[in-house]
């Protein structure tokens, strides 16, 4: 498998002081859907703009399909389709006119009618952009990225604000591009989206990659297999912290402990060993269990454990 995107020791410093990217290295294979996750200010946008050739790094090397921006920028731009989180499209144009406009920027674009059909926009081809729904606008933004017949698709928060049906329609479009051999670099605030779409992903914080791998491997390696969430209170209905976190950490099969949304969350391998010991510990404290649930560990658990906050809190 060939390498589609590669960067080595990427650094970007603003005003000689603020380090937005700190020695970041990535290698994305052709045909992969790769996710870049991180809180606001983590360096994701700066990294992507450097990879897209829009921003010059302070130091480090970038290679797109084996070529450098310094040597072959004009041809390389033909290979990239870019859809930003809030792509600004003229409301005075029709859907067809918008796609035709973007197609005119490239030497060998795809058929506009073909792209409109693929994005399920044929019936809206003569509608004004200003009259489209949120989901239709997002599909149009992706259409403007696909009409150039790209080899690599950069998608920045492609489904933000969409209803579940519109999100799934875009997921199928992304999967279709990937099935045809395309490479996708995706940023998203939706953990379920990253788990469903991404073959591999990297979590970025403070300009550095702090974890990288497939969603399943990251969950297994960093999130535990299961999560036990609980809250306790005093028997007299007063508040009780229910013991320090260190007290829960010594329970059987517990890998990590954190406070999460007013509850204690335990990452565990074998909940059938943890829960009886937890109930016994709560009883010995003289406390009352107010809430108890178990679930499969998720990518969200990995993110919270690594960064200390939920991605949607940003």
What are these regions (language model features)?
Residues 2-7, 12-211:
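ABC transporter nucleotide-binding domains
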Residues 172-269:
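ABC transporter nucleotide-binding domain
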Residues 81, 107, 220-224, 253, ...:
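A generic structural signal for secondary-structure junctions
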């Amino acid at each position: 498998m060939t390498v589609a995107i590669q960067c080595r020791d990427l650094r970007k410093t603003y005003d000689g002081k603020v380090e937005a990217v700190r020695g970041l290295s990535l290698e994305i294979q052709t045909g992969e859907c790769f996710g870049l996750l991180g809180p606001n200010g983590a360096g994701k946008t700066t990294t992507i703009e450097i990879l897209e050739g829009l921003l010059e790094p302070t130091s480090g090397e970038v290679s797109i399909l084996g070529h450098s921006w310094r040597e072959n920028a004009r041809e390389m731009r033909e290979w990239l389709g870019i859809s930003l989180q809030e792509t600004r499209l003229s409301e005075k144009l029709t859907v067809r006119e918008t796609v035709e406009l973007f197609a005119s920027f490239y030497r060998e674009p795809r058929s506009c009618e073909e792209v409109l059909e693929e994005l399920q926009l044929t019936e809206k081809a003569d509608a004004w952009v200003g009259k489209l729904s949120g989901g239709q606008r997002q599909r149009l933004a992706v259409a403007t990225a696909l009409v150039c017949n790209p080899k690599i698709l950069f998608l920045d928060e492609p489904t933000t604000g969409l209803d579940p049906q519109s999100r799934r329609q875009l997921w199928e479009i992304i999967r279709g591009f990937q099935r045809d051999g395309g490479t996708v670099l995706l940023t998203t605030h939706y953990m379920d989206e990253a788990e469903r779409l991404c073959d591999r992903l990297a979590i970025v914080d403070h300009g550095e990659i702090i974890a990288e791998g497939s969603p399943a491997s990251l969950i297994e390696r960093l999130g535990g297999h299961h999560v036990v969430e609980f809250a306790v209170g005093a028997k007299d209905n007063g508040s009780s912290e229910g013991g320090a976190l260190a007290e829960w950490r010594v329970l059987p099969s517990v890998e990590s402990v954190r406070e999460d949304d007013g509850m204690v969350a335990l990452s565990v391998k074998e909940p059938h060993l943890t829960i009886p010991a937890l109930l016994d510990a709560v009883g010995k404290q003289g406390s009352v269990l107010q809430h108890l649930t178990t679930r499969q560990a998720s990518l969200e658990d990995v993110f919270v454990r690594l960064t200390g906050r939920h991605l949607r809190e940003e």
